[in-house]
Amino acid sequence: MRSQLSAPIDTTNFYLSLLHETDFDDLYAVASDPLLWEQHPERDRWRKDVFVLFFQSALVNDLGCFVIREKSSDRVVGSTRFYGLDELGGLVRIGFTFIERSLWGTSANAEIKNAMLTRCFGPFKAVLFDIAPSNRRSIGAVNKLGAIYSETLSPTKAVYRLPKSHWIRQS
């Protein structure tokens, strides 16, 4: 199961491959935009000293972490990952996703998430998304996929649940 989740993902416009230490500079070039983090609980993740900690945790994530490359240019445009695997409960989480602002408002996030969800909905019955209640942009994105609010775990974390039966494929 773990190896299936961490295998590269190929979409029409993007290629998701496992993150490596050598990806730091390219990924930080995307993450260094303060506006990416304005609705995020860790609003200073654009700072290099803060991003280093995020990057290090991504490298040791037990399901790996993806760097997202735009196929047309081979440019790094973001990152995402699977985490929180619950094989008995048939659940996995998708998150820690960010993409460069030039892709906001395009079909990029939907294309990437749909490919990840396609992989999940063979073995899993639902996918969870942990999102800060203040992050309207991310909440809107998962709502478009069919995810519904489940519970608030803390002031900085609400859970949105996407059962396979509710998934709305975005094109």
How would you describe each model-predicted region?
Residues 134-151:
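Conserved active-site alpha-helix within GNAT-family acetyltransferase domains
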Residues 108-109:
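Glycine-rich acyl-CoA binding loop
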Residues 1-105, 114, 118-122, 126, ...:
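GNAT-family acyltransferases
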